[in-house]
Amino acid sequence: LLDSDAVLDAGHIGWAARLSQRYPTVEVRVGDAQLEAADSVLLAALVRGLVLTATAAPGPAPEPELLDAGLWQAARYGLGGRLMGALGDSSAAADQVGMLLEHIRPALEDSGDLDYVHRGVQRMLVSGTGAERQRAAYASEGWDGLTSLFGSALTAEA
């Protein structure tokens, strides 16, 4: 893409996750606009667990088609639907999240994130994601409900 002048620089290539060109970090570009600071911290802890797990014991790379389908399902159905796993299996989102947490459990324990991640995931499974909560607030109370949600969520402690 760079050689063909299709993009200006590597920063414009839109992978869902990639190594940073400038910093010793992994950039994740899906689900990165969270409603609450606590959700952003939860996402960061999950990504750290995934990265530490993958670097400690790399497994086989999932098929790109499965990644694309899984990403589409997650964007479309969120935590309320069925999601595809890395091997193409499909089950309730809560079950897939549970399998993910079990997979990265050693890394979460080593980094001290296990309890925080479990509480955050449980909160999302019960209360909904930020997107789900915004849709529900708007459906029940219109703009006033959305404004009220933003007022409480955007000022909540992490």
What are the language-model segments listed below?
Residues 1-158:
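C-terminal accessory/tail domains of diverse enzymes
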